[in-house]
Amino acid sequence: MADLCVRAPAKINLHLEVLGLRPDGFHELAMVMQSIDLADRLWLRPSADGQISLRCDQPELPTDGTNLIVRAAELLRARSGLVELGAELVLEKRIPIGAGLAGGSSNGAAALVGLNALWGLGFRAEALQAMAAELGSDMPFCLDGGTQFCFGRGERLEPLELQAPLKLALLLVKHPQVSVSTPWAYGRCQALRGDFYLQTEGEFEQRRQALRQGPLSQSLLRGLVQSTPLPPLRNDLQAVVEAEVESVRQGLALLRQAQPPLVEQPLAVAMSGSGPSLFALFPSLERAQAAHAALADELEQGGFGAWCCSFSSRGVSLER
C-alpha cells in the first residue's frame, strides 16, 4: 500500500474560561477554539513486523510511548483486535513544541485518522472521537477543527453557527527556548482563583449558556465575522502565565505595539491556551504579514519566532 499523509493543524483559543473543578480532578472549561493553517504532516506506511515506530525531523521531540502519536496508534490497534497491525510513522514538525497550540493533540488525532485509513479499519467518526477523548482533552477538537465551542475538559464540541468560514489571519509569536507546563498553569490558576470557582453543574451550564448566547459572545462573533475590532479576548490562564514568564510579557507588549501609522492596529492580542504562544488577529493575511515586517527587528532582538497564519475551517485531514 502506498504511503498516506495526514495534515495536522494547530489551534488557538479565542476564549478560555476556567469555570471550576470537576469530580474527576480536571478543570471544567468554556472555550472557543479555532483551527489555523500552521500544520504538521504525519506520513504513514504499514510495517510487516507488527511494530509501531515513530521518527521526527525534530530530535528534541520524544518518539517513544509517551508521544500521543504512538499512544493513539496503540489504542486504535487494541480497539481493532488486530494485534498484528504495524506502521512506520514519520512526523514533519512545523508547529512549535510546548506552545499552547495543541500540536501534540493534533498529531495524535492525525494518527487516529491516518491509521484508520491505512489499516482499513472503518471506524466511524463517533468512535474516533471517543478514542480521542480518552487520549487528550484537545484531541476531539483537533479531529473536527474549524470554529467551535468546547466544554467539559475541552472534549464536548458545539460548532458555532456561521454562514461561512471565518477569514481572519494572525501573527503568531513564541520564544523558542520557553515552554509552559499546562498542569502548572492550571494549578497556579486554582491557587489564585480557586475561591471564585463555580461549584455545581447548574452553575457551569449557566456560564456555558452565557458563552453561547450572551452579549460578550455575540460581540465576539460579530467582530470575527465582520473583521472589526473585538472585545478583549478572555483567557483565564493569561494573567497567571504573564505574571511568571518574562517572554510572555515581552511578546504581548511587542504585539500591542502594532499601531497606526506604523501598521494597522490588530483586532485583538492574546495568549493561546496555557502559552507561551501569543497572537495578534488581523482582517487578512496581508495585514498580518505587514505587521510582521514592521515588528521584525524587535521580534528578532527579543529572540521570538514568528509565523503568519490564516484561520482554517477543518481539522486533521488526509492529503494522500
Model-derived features: positions:
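Glycine/serine-rich anion-binding loops at beta->alpha junctions
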Residues: 62, 90-119, 137, 268-282
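Short beta-strand segments
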Residues: 7, 90-92, 143, 151, ...
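Conserved, helical-rich catalytic subdomain that frames metal- and/or nucleotide-binding sites
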Residues: 144, 153-268, 283-286, 293-296, ...
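Residue-level signal for inorganic ion chemistry
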Residues: 14, 42-44, 69, 104, ...
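Contiguous, small/hydrophobic- and glycine-enriched helical/loop subdomains that border
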Residues: 85-86, 108, 112-149, 153-156
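ATP-binding N-lobe of GHMP and related small-molecule kinases
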Residues: 1-99, 117, 121-126, 178, ...
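Solvent-exposed alpha-helices and their adjacent loops that cap or buttress functional pockets
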Residues: 35, 81, 133-134, 140-143, ...
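Short beta-strand-to-loop capping motifs
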Residues: 18, 46, 174-175, 280-284
